[in-house]
Amino acid sequence: MTSYSPINVKQLSQSSLPQKHKLQTFSIDVDKLLKRHYTPFLTWPSWFQRLVSWTLRLIIRQDTVNKFLSENSHLQSFDFIEKAFDELCFNYHFNAQDLENIPAKGGVIIFANHPLGALDGLSLLHLVSLVRRDVKIVANQLLSNITPLAPLLLPVDNLKGDSRKQDLVNIARALEADQAVIFFPAGEVSRLSPKGIQDKVWDAGFLRFSERLNLPMMPIYIKARNSGLFYSIARFSSTASMLLLPLEMIRYSGRFQFFTSPVITPEQLAPLSLSRKEKVKLLRKHLYQLPKNKPPVFTTKKSLIHPQSRQSLRLELKSAEKLGSTSDGKSIFLFTPHRDSVVLDELGRLREEAFRAVGEGTGHKKDTDLYDAYYRHIIVWDDDLLEIAGAYRLGEVWKWCKQDESCFVASQHHFHRPSQGLYSESLFKFRDGSENGITNNISEVMEAGLELGRSFVQPQFWGKRSLDYLWQGIGAYIARHPKVRYLFGPVSLSASLPARARDMLVWYYQNYYPESHFTAEPRAGFKLSTSAIAEMEKLMDGSNPQKDYANLRDQLSHMQMRVPTLYKQYSELCHYGGVSFSAFNVDS
């Protein structure tokens, strides 16, 4: 468990960007707030109004608060929050994992319980800002009176139980701009109930935004409580207890701790035959389970590790071998990993992100394995955006095979360096010799071979020729190493494909691109069923690859599918007969 004081947290935060603001003075006026937001106040005798106002000014220390606001009117956003924390001697607690669960980019809806009041919102804004600065919070009109916080707020009129259309439009625009937006679904501070201190009934607004914009939701539970006096008064008067909240904030000295969960996606909720109200109840239950170490309501994938420092990536890639440049100014590098490599961590993060985007992925924080450390990586780097656009992993088998003996002796490799063998060997067994009329020249292939695999293109670079640029890099590598004459490696079919689409693809590529140079035996082989084979033989010509490929594409399009990019590219890369799909393995 890690505890952060305001000073510790401030050191982690980035400095606020300088902005041009007209200096404003602002203050809290209890009398005006009562007249504006508590209608019965206007019906009271004037002497009683003055008495109530005077009493509340003392309780909330209005003069002290206004002095602080006046002295710090030059501060904005997160700087103002940190100054307020210093003034209140306030700190909060969280685990390192809690911070890792916050998505570092992309639109996300953060929903939380609301135990205290303003401190909940300020601390949540501050916590999220440690990961990303593009965060806003849906807040009531009272909080929006504090001018320095205005850039962080999306005001709604919770007190009247009604939100203007423009308020909702502003929230949607923030989310569509890939910002993080914080919601308190209860709309008011938690109350004492038979089950303890809990929120009142949640509004479903945050779920509506998630469904409409197809955005993930991240739960954050806040473990904190107000004083016994507050809950006692709240039983009789919600308005009176609300007026006590400033005093509760000033006097707060209890423990304040965050518990977070990885995001919950709209796809997880869509199959549930439940009303929106019932789904909100499940989300609420999931949130309240977080501090109890109980099984969560929703199974979540681990959040991706946060992006590596852009400058660290750039510096590390400067030492890599440059293979070339693209027509639009990107650089192509051949990267050799080393211990504690930030580039390798970023490759693992982006690889997992890319595979999750198509319904796959390991479910881990990053997709790396033991082979990444001694394989090399072709990387396309965008120096304008400081982003890795995509990568291919290379196993330099032609270097690793000993020159004085076969690469394969009794099915065992003899390598200079990698004791773990090849990545493809974890999925297939290779054999020398003759089988099914095929002379297997595995040793010849390996001695001049380059293993390819684990390729990806970062989603924001899809459709921007990034895969072509990776092949430009592979071509440049082969030009520098003319001994390489064979390319081989695994290529995957998504598990999310309909069974019929999968069967059609396997049949087509087995039929027209059979094994030719060597036999690969799958460790967990995939076999077409008799009925699937019968259907394919009826559907396909069987001897005309162009005609059957057109048929394959048409059949896949009816299922809203298409031929996987790498299958299409590999088969088009060589003249007919120059590429084979030797075997199909089921990856566990």
Task: Map each language-model feature to its residues.
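Glycine- and acidic-residue-rich phosphate-binding/metal-coordinating active-site segment common to enzymes
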Residues: 148-192, 196-213, 218-221, 234-236, ...
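Glycine-rich, often proline-containing surface loops adjacent to acidic residues and nearby aromatics
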Residues: 104-109, 149-151, 181, 259, ...
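Short amphipathic alpha-helix that is part of the acyltransferase structural core
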Residues: 323-377, 381, 387-396
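Acyl-donor binding region in acyl/amide transferases
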Residues: 352, 362, 400-577, 582-585
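Membrane-anchoring hydrophobic helices of lipid-metabolizing enzymes
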Residues: 2-108, 114, 121-123, 130-132, ...
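Non-catalytic C-terminal accessory region of glycerolipid acyltransferases
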Residues: 30, 165-312, 534-542
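Conserved N-terminal entry element of GNAT/NAT acetyltransferase domains
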Residues: 301-338
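A short helix-loop-beta-strand connector motif used in the catalytic cores of GNAT acetyltransferases and
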Residues: 370-379, 402-403, 577-578, 588
